[in-house]
Swiss-Prot record:
Function comment: Involved in protein export. Acts as a chaperone by maintaining the newly synthesized protein in an open conformation. Functions as a peptidyl-prolyl cis-trans isomerase.
Enzyme class per UniProt: isomerase
Annotated disulfide bonds: none
Protein's UniProt keywords contain Aminoacyl-tRNA synthetase: no
Molecular function GO terms recorded: peptidyl-prolyl cis-trans isomerase activity; protein folding chaperone; ribosome binding
Keywords noted in UniProt: Cell cycle, Cell division, Chaperone, Cytoplasm, Isomerase, Rotamase
A Pfam family the protein falls into: Trigger_C
Identification of the protein by name: Trigger factor
Lineage of producing organism: Bacteria, Pseudomonadati, Pseudomonadota, Alphaproteobacteria, Acetobacterales
One Gene Ontology cellular component annotation held by this UniProt entry: cytoplasm
Main location: cytoplasm
Description of its domains: Consists of 3 domains; the N-terminus binds the ribosome, the middle domain has PPIase activity, while the C-terminus has intrinsic chaperone activity on its own.
Subcellular location field: Cytoplasm
HAMAP family: Trigger_factor_Tig
Length: 440
């Protein structure tokens, strides 16, 4: 085999490979001989079909098979001999493959860059932490109890106030004429609640059971009924009953009714949930800070093929958000050229950071265990109650789909490794500060 390097430009490499025709001829004859041992043909005993007849019947197919195998073997050998690390699958193009002549083909590829791992011990990070207070546990339990509140009719003669529930009949009109979908009977309206036209519920505050009132509202510009969007309308309101929510008393009996031995166990459950939530937010913040530090030091070139693939995936998501009208305000104000440039820079950063994280893991023998994979699968199944069996069967039938789980696991294990070496200082912050920007 003869290999000539034709391109060395940045991370791009090009080669011309020539495999002697004699090698191909030898492989073809060997393959034909193998076929002759099993080939059956009328008039001949099994394995006794003349090689000339085997060649006539299978010659072209064997030639194609041998050529493909030779290209693959020669490419792999060439890459291994030169210790190349392709970024993506090499591009191979056959130049010459005539019978009884040498096989000539070209190989073009991008190699992974030389990645220098920064001194992880020199990295300093701050890890925000927000201790759970007794008052916050009280608030969490109170919200839980409020969700299980029952309603009761208000018997005293008083006007409706924020937090009350007013049972009403209403009739909407435009220019004095009732419009479709604008009427309701015995409808419970929570004063101060959401989900109504702005100003609708608010104008019912102060009404008493038995009273009537005409209110005026303006429908939102983005209202689902186009004929009403941005239009003014009136509603005839008849208040029929005033109700209020009565939250259950938070005591041992309430705790027992919800599956706990006593109030102390109930409080511990909520304390643990709050702690877990904050531990997750704290972990996310310090992980982001670490990855930002690593990204700053990932100053090696990024393979264009990987950047192109990453950008294509990002841009598909951007286009989907744009079509759904969910593009954020900042991006919506940019022209496409600027938007593409911004997201290509993000794609390049992701590729560089991914290569650095991969190199840290490879160099330090970070491994994904079967236990890691089981935990990840259990976590995924917990997100879809009742579909556990279907998810398990999916992964059993599609082993390559497990790569989607391996990536995040590997990244987290590398982060754990790096955090053990870095200097991490805990800083107490408020819960609001801890959770700020954690949903980006």
């Amino acid at each position: 085999m003869q290999v000539t390097e034709t391109l060395t430009e940045g991370l791009k490499r090009g080669f011309t490979v020539v495999v002697p025709g004699s090698d191909l001829s030898e492989k073809r004859e060997k393959r034909l001989a193998e076929l002759s041992k099993t080939m059956q043909m009328p008039g001949f005993r099994p394995g006794k079909v003349p090689l000339s007849m085997v060649r006539k019947r299978f010659g072209d197919a064997v030639a194609a098979e041998v050529m493909e195998a030779s290209v693959n073997e020669a490419t792999e050998r060439m890459i291994n001999d030169r210790s190349l690390r392709p970024a993506v699958q090499p591009k191979v193009e056959v130049v010459r493959a005539e019978p009884d002549s040498d096989l000539e083909f070209t190989v073009e590829l991008e190699v992974l860059p030389e990645v220098t791992i920064p001194d992880l011990k020199a990295i300093s990070l701050t890890r925000p932490k927000a201790p759970v207070t007794e008052a916050e546990i009280d608030e969490a339990i109170a919200r839980f109890a409020e969700q299980r509140a029952e309603t009761e009719v208000v018997t005293e003669d008083r006007p409706a106030a924020t937090g009350d529930i007013l049972t009403v009949d209403f009739l909407g009109k435009r220019d004095g004429v009732p419009f479709e979908g604008g009427a309701g009977t015995d409808t419970d309206i929570e004063l101060g609640g959401s989900g109504f036209i702005p100003g609708f519920a608010e104008q019912m505050e102060g009404m008493k059971a038995g009273e009537t009132k005409v209110i005026t509202v303006t429908f939102p510009e983005q209202y689902h009924a186009a004929e009403l969007a941005g239009k003014e309308a009136t509603f005839d309101i008849t208040a029929k009953a005033l109700k209020r929510r009565v939250a259950p008393v938070i005591d041992d009996a309430f705790a027992e009714a919800n599956g706990f031995e006593n109030l102390a166990e109930f409080r511990k459950f909520f304390a643990d949930r709050l702690e877990q939530s904050r531990a997750g937010a704290s972990r996310l913040k310090v992980k982001r800070a670490l990855l930002d530090k690593l990204a700053e030091q990932a100053d090696f070139p990024a393979p264009a093929s990987l950047v192109d693939a990453e950008f294509a995936e990002i841009w598909r998501q951007v286009e989907a958000e744009k079509q759904a009208g969910r593009l954020d305000e900042e991006d919506a104000g940019k022209d496409e050229e600027t938007l593409r440039a911004d997201y290509r820079a993000i794609a390049e950063r992701r590729v560089r950071l991914g290569l650095l994280v991969a190199e840290i893991g490879r160099t330090n023998n970070v491994q994904i265990t079967e236990q890691d994979m089981r935990r990840a699968m259990i976590a995924e199944m917990q997100q879809f109650p009742g579909q556990e069996k279907m998810i398990m069967e999916f992964y059993q039938k599609n082993p390559r789909a497990l790569d989607r789980l391996r990536g995040p696991i590997f990244e987290d294990k590398v982060v754990d490794y790096a955090l053990e070496l870095a200097t991490v200082t805990d800083e107490e912050v408020s819960a609001e500060a801890l959770f700020a920007d954690t949903d980006d």
